[in-house]
Amino acid sequence: LYRFHQWWYAERDHDHNGICEYGSTDGTLIAAAWESGMDNGVRFDDTRMLKNEMEKAWSMDQENICLNSFLYVDKLTLSEMASILGKQELSEQLAKEAEVIKLYVQTKMYDSESGFFYDIRLNDRTPVKVMGAEGWLPLWAGIATPEQAESVKNIMMDEKHFNSYLPLGTLDVSHPALRPTFGYWRGPVWFNQVYFGITGLKRYGYVEEADLLTRKFMAHAQGLMTDGPIHENYNPLTGEVLNAPNFGWSSALILRLLLDQ
């Protein structure tokens, strides 16, 4: 597990600053976007690829807020595992590295003007100002300061941004690139991002808001309150089912949402 974790820093940290980027082995942007899991996300529309030092290693030219939130949690988890195994030096090293990510995200990847977290460009550290579901990952991870979490919460609860008919879509519903029907990661609602968002709100004490969004999601996603199949994603404006039925992580995460109530 530790070797896999370290792979990111060997293959996907273009400037060796301890903050990673999604990338690919063949230098193509589409493969790098696939690596993110958010295949056609709007934040990647103007992204370019950079060759890294390792053979067959390329990075996007932007540091990714979701990836580094995941890596922060990885470091804390691995630190705890190392401590249990008696590897105290490694445990302390990982904990220190996690703090580096936390401070960087708080100070570099949060935009105080808009009150949201974003990917940032490598060349000038400016934010890629596309409000997407990745922006609440620092709440799920426990990285955000209380003030930052409150600002992100306000945006999540705003009907002009993410509190749409079916809430917590993958793109701000006021964004001109929104494609609510068959847009895949350009607006539709995915269960995993809903789960991250609701869990993040609860982590910072916004239980009432989290419960409101959970109830709204369950009531408005087509078929969830009947015997309809659970789908891959949903239209944020209508709740209409989209793409593959009987989708695995969607089904699993409904249970998590309900059990966490």
Labelled PLM ranges:
Residues L67-F70, L94:
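Amphipathic alpha-helix face/heptad-repeat signature
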Residues L1-W8, D74, L78, L85-V105, ...:
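Extended, well-ordered alpha-helical scaffold segments
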Residues Y195, T199, D211, R215-A219, ...:
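A generic structural signal for well-ordered alpha-helical surface patches
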Residues N64, F182-Y206:
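Peripheral, non-catalytic segments that deliver or gate enzyme domains
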Residues M60, N64-L67, K87:
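Amphipathic alpha-helical coiled-coil segments and their boundaries
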